[in-house]
């Protein structure tokens, strides 16, 4: 679990987003995008790590963005278990798999927004802001709409 420095208070002023992905490249890219939009971000390598974080830091996370296909626990199961802990926690599913390969899993969670990788910071912003609101204060950096996952072949979902 990365927390990007210990100098931050336990409960940041900005809404905090938890990014869950078993692949380093999309996890770090999504984390950077979330921060470029002005939000705080935490990252987890899988669903088990994400659930531990949610249990250990109740009320800190305002949104979970999770990959669909991961070892140990898929994004759908993570969504169910996270909602058991925090019933109104917004969750976004994401994947680079072709829709035909994950359609059944996505269809099982019609209430959850879905992001197809690769996506832009602007696409992410359009999903995040209605769910948790804009950042409390303007961020020093501008969201880089050109930040994209550059190598789809390097990760599997």
Each PLM stretch: what is its role?
Residues 23-27:
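Short acidic/polar segment at the start of the alpha1 helix of CheY-like receiver
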Residues 1-18, 28-35, 55, 59-60, ...:
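Non-catalytic signal-transmission and effector/linker regions of two-component phosphorelay proteins
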Residues 67:
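Active-site residues of response regulator receiver
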Residues 70:
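Receiver (REC) domain active-site loop signature in two-component systems and cognate sites
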């Amino acid at each position: 679990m990365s927390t990007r420095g210990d100098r931050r208070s336990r409960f940041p002023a900005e809404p905090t987003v938890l990014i869950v992905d078993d692949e380093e490249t999309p996890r770090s890219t999504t984390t950077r995008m979330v921060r470029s939009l002005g939000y705080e971000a935490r990252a987890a390598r899988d669903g088990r790590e994400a659930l531990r974080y949610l249990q250990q830091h109740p009320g800190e996370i305002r949104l979970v963005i999770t990959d669909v296909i991961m070892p140990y626990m898929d994004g759908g199961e993570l969504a169910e278990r996270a909602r058991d802990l925090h019933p109104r926690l917004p969750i976004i599913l994401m994947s680079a798999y072709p829709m035909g390969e994950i359609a059944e899993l996505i269809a099982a969670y019609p209430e959850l927004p879905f992001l197809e990788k690769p996506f832009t910071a602007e696409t992410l912003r359009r999903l995040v802001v209605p769910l948790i609101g804009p950042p409390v204060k303007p961020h020093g950096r501008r969201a880089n709409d050109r930040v994209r996952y550059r190598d789809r072949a390097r990760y599997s979902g």
